[in-house]
């Protein structure tokens, strides 16, 4: 039985563009196949949701503070009016433990991201030459992808 998806064209497009917008059939399966193919080609992969991402550069790459949810009346004198700020490690920190591998960050539900957030993802890719990002931008009848910069031009500039 021949392979339905070898990942060669996807790998070549990912290497040249570094940031891709992907449209996959809603029944799934293509994402994990492509991730497996990229791992076989030497990529270290990390998959996460784009929901609640906030500032992508800070949330993915830098140490940042997160306030816990407000749970009713609390003492103002202990933590100030805004509450205690807990320091959280970057979400994609496990990608950056190894410097020798190519890194692939796969973001699910990317259709919730704004134009500026997508542009900052492209900027992150250009700053780190070993990092590549794939953003799932919704469903399609067949698997297709295009550079994220082209997606931004098509979607937001019209």
Curated annotation (Swiss-Prot):
UniProt entry tagged with the keyword RNA-binding: no
Keywords assigned: Membrane, NAD, NADP, Plastoquinone, Quinone, Thylakoid, Translocase, Transport
GO cellular component, as recorded: plasma membrane-derived thylakoid membrane
InterPro entries: NAD(P)H-quinone_OxRdtase_su_N (IPR020874)
Reaction catalysed by this enzyme: a plastoquinone + NADH + (n+1) H(+)(in) = a plastoquinol + NAD(+) + n H(+)(out); a plastoquinone + NADPH + (n+1) H(+)(in) = a plastoquinol + NADP(+) + n H(+)(out)
EC number of this enzyme: 7.1.1.-
Molecular function via GO: oxidoreductase activity, acting on NAD(P)H, quinone or similar compound as acceptor; quinone binding
Main location: membrane
Subcellular location: Cellular thylakoid membrane
Residues passing through the membrane, by range: none
Functional description taken from the UniProt entry: NDH-1 shuttles electrons from an unknown electron donor, via FMN and iron-sulfur (Fe-S) centers, to quinones in the respiratory and/or the photosynthetic chain. The immediate electron acceptor for the enzyme in this species is believed to be plastoquinone. Couples the redox reaction to proton translocation, and thus conserves the redox energy in a proton gradient. Cyanobacterial NDH-1 also plays a role in inorganic carbon-concentration.
Protein name as it appears in the record: NAD(P)H-quinone oxidoreductase subunit N
Gene that encodes the chain: ndhN
